[in-house]
């Protein structure tokens, strides 16, 4: 048996006909149209999201979890294996320093308002210099093993902010 495009159709019973409600008592769905008697749910346009008729709603029965860390960093994650693929495909230049802008242009670093974090998944064979916001120990070791280097931003020493300055000024004033 050959199948022709102009003879394709659904199996019998695959599409059930729509029930037309409110069309007389003989239809079985007349008068109240399956909505029961009076009340809020018998009226039109009423559907209260999350309301379960006085029963404690599901979204309130389940415990709250987690929090939003206001100090959390948003890094774009890039693996060494992906960088090597891009170098092999000539989408990245191994001789130039690879930074957030270069990785974004290559289509790897999406988002990451705090920069790029380099991870060690995959293998890197090219000698590359990275200028990134963060890198795992394994990634740094893998890059250095391949003959490259990872330039990370200088970390500020503890107590180098406004509060420490004010404390130092107050101590000098009292002395």
From Swiss-Prot:
- Residue ranges under compositional bias (Gly residues)? 23-37
Look up keyword RNA-binding and say if it applies: yes
Sorted alphabetically, the keyword list is: Ribonucleoprotein, Ribosomal protein, RNA-binding, rRNA-binding
Q: Name one Pfam family in it.
A: Ribosomal_L27A
Write out the ranges of the annotated region (Disordered): 1-44, 150-175
User: One biological process GO term for this chain?
Assistant: translation
Compositional bias (Basic and acidic residues) at which positions?
1-13
Q: Which GO terms describe its cellular component?
A: cytosolic large ribosomal subunit
Q: What is a GO molecular function of this protein?
A: rRNA binding
User: Which InterPro entries would you find in this protein's record?
Assistant: Ribosomal_uL15, Ribosomal_uL15/eL18, Ribosomal_uL15/eL18_sf, Ribosomal_uL15_bac-type, Ribosomal_uL15_CS
Role this protein plays: Binds to the 23S rRNA.
Annotated PANTHER family: 50S RIBOSOMAL PROTEIN L15, LARGE RIBOSOMAL SUBUNIT PROTEIN UL15M
According to the record's subunit comment, the protein's assembly and interactions are: Part of the 50S ribosomal subunit.
Q: Which family is annotated?
A: Belongs to the universal ribosomal protein uL15 family.
Q: What is this protein called?
A: Large ribosomal subunit protein uL15
UniProt organism field: Sphingopyxis alaskensis (strain DSM 13593 / LMG 18877 / RB2256)
The gene for this chain is: rplO
């Amino acid at each position: 048996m050959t199948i022709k495009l102009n003879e394709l159709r659904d199996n019998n019973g695959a599409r059930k006909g729509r029930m037309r409600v409110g069309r007389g008592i003989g239809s079985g769905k007349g008068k109240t149209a399956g909505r029961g008697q009076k009340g809020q749910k018998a009226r039109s346009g009423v559907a209260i999201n999350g309301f379960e008729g006085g029963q404690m709603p599901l979204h309130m029965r389940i415990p709250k979890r987690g929090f939003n860390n206001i100090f959390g960093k948003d890094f774009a994650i890039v693996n060494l294996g992906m960088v090597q693929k891009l170098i092999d495909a000539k989408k990245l230049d191994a001789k130039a320093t690879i930074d957030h802008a270069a990785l974004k242009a290559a289509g790897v670093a999406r988002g990451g308002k705090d920069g790029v974090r380099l991870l060690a998944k995959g293998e890197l064979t090219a000698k590359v210099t990275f200028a990134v916001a963060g890198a795992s120990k394994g990634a740094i070791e893998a890059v250095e093993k391949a003959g490259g280097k990872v330039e990370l931003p200088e970390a500020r020493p503890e107590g180098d902010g406004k509060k420490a300055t004010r404390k130092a000024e107050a101590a000098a004033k009292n002395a």
